[in-house]
């Protein structure tokens, strides 16, 4: 809680095997607060945090088998890359030779061994992130906590780094819990996704489960790729790629977005409603659609997924 504001409510998360877990949601939904509670940087007002069956709720962050990689990396500018990575081992009292040996090994894991003698201001953003990642992993935590680690990177590097994170998690065999507001990031990285909103977990599942069977209108809208449609008293989700366009009809094309292999088309029905339709570039080329065209839209009943409110 922050004053009278409840940051996270009734969260029940169980991670059984080492996997990549993403906490996904809009700004202010409670995902970073939940991450900080696991790390011990925020107190919990009720419930417990258990790791390997042991309650760590009362333990200080340094006493928990977790390590946290912060959004701003928080590297020490006056220390070399090697000493940044080895810093936690120095605090634990390890000798210089031993901690440097372990730090070299960790830098090898993140492909930065050749830059061990450099300083943070000599590194690119992606290299700084790798240093922060190596520093977080040097203590051999059971759980690595990542607070929006890719948000400061350009789109190309972000895609490259998320592949490296996933491969590293598999190789190390530990659980990564990763906070993000990017749907694409969560879908690409996660074995398990928690979709959060206003301090509550709206849905938990694999990326495929979340996308194919969103539980409610919030999840369908936030994950994207769906139209949320009201038919009588019920609410349905229909995937954008399940809607078909035919020439001539009561709807009008209001926007066309070319996205490489796919094209997104927004159509309005003249009564204030709109639908977004996704087609392959080949489908779009065959129909020869243009802004302002009158078209018909349809979908099969089996492609309607009923939602809770």
Predicted regions: what they are:
Residues 39:
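Helix-to-loop junction immediately C-terminal to a conserved catalytic motif
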Residues 47-55:
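Conserved ABC transporter NBD signature motif
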Residues 61-215:
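ABC ATPase nucleotide-binding domains
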Residues 235-309:
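Non-catalytic connector elements of ABC transporters
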């Amino acid at each position: 809680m922050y004053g009278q504001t409840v940051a996270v409510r009734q969260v029940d998360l169980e991670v059984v095997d080492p996997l990549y877990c993403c906490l996904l949601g809009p700004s202010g939904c409670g995902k970073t607060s939940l991450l900080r509670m696991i790390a011990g940087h925020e107190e919990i007002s009720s419930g417990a945090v258990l790791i390997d069956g042991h309650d760590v709720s009362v333990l200080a962050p340094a006493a928990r088998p977790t390590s946290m990689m912060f959004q701003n990396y928080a590297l020490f500018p006056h220390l070399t890359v090697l000493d940044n990575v080895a810093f936690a081992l120095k605090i634990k009292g390890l000798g210089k030779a031993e901690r440097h040996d372990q730090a070299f090994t960790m830098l090898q894991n993140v492909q930065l061994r050749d830059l061990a003698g450099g300083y943070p201001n000599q590194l690119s953003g992606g290299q700084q992130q790798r240093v922060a990642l190596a520093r977080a992993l040097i203590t051999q935590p059971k759980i690595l906590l990542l607070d929006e680690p890719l948000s400061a990177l350009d789109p190309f590097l972000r895609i490259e780094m998320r592949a490296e994170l996933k491969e590293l998690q598999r190789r190390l065999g530990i659980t990564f819990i990763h906070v993000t507001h990017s749907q694409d990031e969560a879908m690409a990285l996660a074995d398990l996704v928690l979709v959060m909103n206003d301090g509550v977990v709206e849905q938990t599942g694999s990326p495929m489960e979340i996308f194919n069977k969103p539980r409610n209108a919030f999840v369908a809208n936030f994950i994207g790729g769906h139209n949320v449609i009201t038919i009588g008293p019920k609410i349905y989700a229909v995937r954008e790629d399940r809607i078909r366009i035919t020439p001539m009809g009561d709807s009008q094309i209001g926007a066309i977005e070319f996205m490489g292999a796919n094209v997104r088309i927004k159509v309005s029905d003249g009564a204030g409603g709109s639908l977004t339709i996704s087609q392959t570039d080949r489908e779009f080329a065959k129909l020869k659609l243009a802004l302002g065209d009158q078209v018909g839209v349809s979908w099969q009943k089996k492609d309607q997924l009923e939602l809770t409110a």
